[in-house]
């Protein structure tokens, strides 16, 4: 079930958008996203009540279409909203502590290598986000790209872990990422910066699903 939810994972905050974030999410949902992460970080990001209000409106849209709503690195916000889960990075709150706080909500953990995958699983993570696969412009603090070979390496040792790949993934590279062993792709700019968001999202969704069906996943 989780592996299906990860197929097209849209990550977004207000500063990622050149259009109204609510309109962007509406178009992305129509195009076929299967999971959504609210990531309000970086210079100019909303805080306090403004952040809460935007998250609340985005959550309402996800609820209407049964799209899991994940909050990036803000357990308090996730609990206040009754979101579906939390995603944390290696430099964020410790995964074990987050699991204790959120109970049976979804827990996702950013990883960059096999050792971090094993630690995430020990913390009872529901999925891992591996990346950046390719160089990315969406995160100022992004680590060095790990490439498709890291997906293959992790999949060789952890065949069952739900794994979504993130970082510089485009319409041109999505198929390769799935073929390497990822259960889905997580994208920010590939949707946020698209001129026609619905059409771009639909193409990405169809590409991922074709690749997954071909690989019998």
From Swiss-Prot:
Mg(2+) binds at residues 73, 92. 2-[(2R,5Z)-2-carboxy-4-methylthiazol-5(2H)-ylidene]ethyl phosphate binds at residues 136-138, 168, 188-189. Its EC number is 2.5.1.3. It catalyses: 2-[(2R,5Z)-2-carboxy-4-methylthiazol-5(2H)-ylidene]ethyl phosphate + 4-amino-2-methyl-5-(diphosphooxymethyl)pyrimidine + 2 H(+) = thiamine phosphate + CO2 + diphosphate; 2-(2-carboxy-4-methylthiazol-5-yl)ethyl phosphate + 4-amino-2-methyl-5-(diphosphooxymethyl)pyrimidine + 2 H(+) = thiamine phosphate + CO2 + diphosphate; 4-methyl-5-(2-phosphooxyethyl)-thiazole + 4-amino-2-methyl-5-(diphosphooxymethyl)pyrimidine + H(+) = thiamine phosphate + diphosphate. Pathway: Cofactor biosynthesis; thiamine diphosphate biosynthesis; thiamine phosphate from 4-amino-2-methyl-5-diphosphomethylpyrimidine and 4-methyl-5-(2-phosphoethyl)-thiazole: step 1/1. Its cofactor is Mg(2+). The keyword Transferase applies. 4-amino-2-methyl-5-(diphosphooxymethyl)pyrimidine binds at residues 37-41, 72, 110, 139. GO terms for biological process: thiamine biosynthetic process; thiamine diphosphate biosynthetic process. Keywords: Magnesium, Metal-binding, Thiamine biosynthesis, Transferase. It is an enzyme of class 2 (transferase). HAMAP family: TMP_synthase. Condenses 4-methyl-5-(beta-hydroxyethyl)thiazole monophosphate (THZ-P) and 2-methyl-4-amino-5-hydroxymethyl pyrimidine pyrophosphate (HMP-PP) to form thiamine monophosphate (TMP). Belongs to the thiamine-phosphate synthase family. This is Thiamine-phosphate synthase.
């Amino acid at each position: 079930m989780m592996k299906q939810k990860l197929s097209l994972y849209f990550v977004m905050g207000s500063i990622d958008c050149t259009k109204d974030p609510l309109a962007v999410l509406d178009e992305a949902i129509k195009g076929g996203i299967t999971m959504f992460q609210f990531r309000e970080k970086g210079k100019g990001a909303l805080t306090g009540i403004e952040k809460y209000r935007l998250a609340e409106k985005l959550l309402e849209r996800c609820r209407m279409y049964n799209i899991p709503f994940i909050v990036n690195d803000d357990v308090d916000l996730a609990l206040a909203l009754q979101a579906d889960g939390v995603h944390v990075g290696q430099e964020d709150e410790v995964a074990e502590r987050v699991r204790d706080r959120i109970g049976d909500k979804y827990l996702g953990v950013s990883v960059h290598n096999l050792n971090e995958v094993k630690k995430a699983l020990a913390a009872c993570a529901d999925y891992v986000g591996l990346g950046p696969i390719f160089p990315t412009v969406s995160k100022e603090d992004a680590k060095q790209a790990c490439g498709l070979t890291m997906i293959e390496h992790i999949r060789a040792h952890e065949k069952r872990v739900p794994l979504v790949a993130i970082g510089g993934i485009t319409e041109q590279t999505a198929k390769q990422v799935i073929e390497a062993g990822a259960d889905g792709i997580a994208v920010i700019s590939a949707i946020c910066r698209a001129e026609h968001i619905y059409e771009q999202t639909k193409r990405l969704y169809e590409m991922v699903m074709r690749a997954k069906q071909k690989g019998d996943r």
